[in-house]
Amino acid sequence: MRSCLIQLVLLFALVFCLLWFALPLGVGALATGALNASGFSGTDTKVEVSASPPPMLLTGHADKIHITSSQVSISDLHAASVDVTLRDIDMLSRKIGTVGGTLEGVRVAAPNGDPVAIDEVTLDGSATATTATCRMSVATVQTLAQSQLKTQTGIAAKVVLKGPNLVTVTVNGKSQSGRLLTSNGSLLLVPNGNTLPTVTLIAPGAGNPFRVTSVTIGLADLTLVGTINVQDLLT
């Protein structure tokens, strides 16, 4: 009888250890497979799944999924590195509550398809409308403005940015002032007057999952704040 009881205790302890320690590892492997099935590709990808208590994972609920990877591509988003945490996840319905983290070396597409470099993107908020704070160099945006002006209008110009959102466009030695503005998720160069047309620098849609809502020009960096639907991106 005593031997039987000891065996039951040992069996219970084994099951407990499997549920408490091994279950998150197993679910992590399944989550990695689901991530890859969604179109995610990356190098050295690590997915850590946790729930409190761990047996809650058997119901399909995870408190947190932490994803790190490099050389990432997923749908229209490309990044040199990703460090993102998903919270309050229903793995059965693939619904995500909130998102937080950082993307570095991000590339999106300009309206003409050319790549646009974003140094860093910080994510925070609801998975369906995550606030994305993007940091770009002023030099990158000036080059982007010049290339899009040339592509969209045929006008060769020099573009200089100045805080908080001012622009000077010089064509054949003549300068025209303007502003960087946002409208319907796009970043626009809007010249004052009617001499030059409005030029779209970044627009949501093919090649760009971000919707821009505000822009601020600093001394060396430009900050874009907008939203991204991480839920759609990962499912």
Predicted segments with their positions:
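Hydrophobic membrane-targeting and insertion signals
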Residues: M1-H61, H66-D76, L219, V225, ...
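Short secondary-structure junctions
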Residues: A37-T45, L149-G154, G205-F210
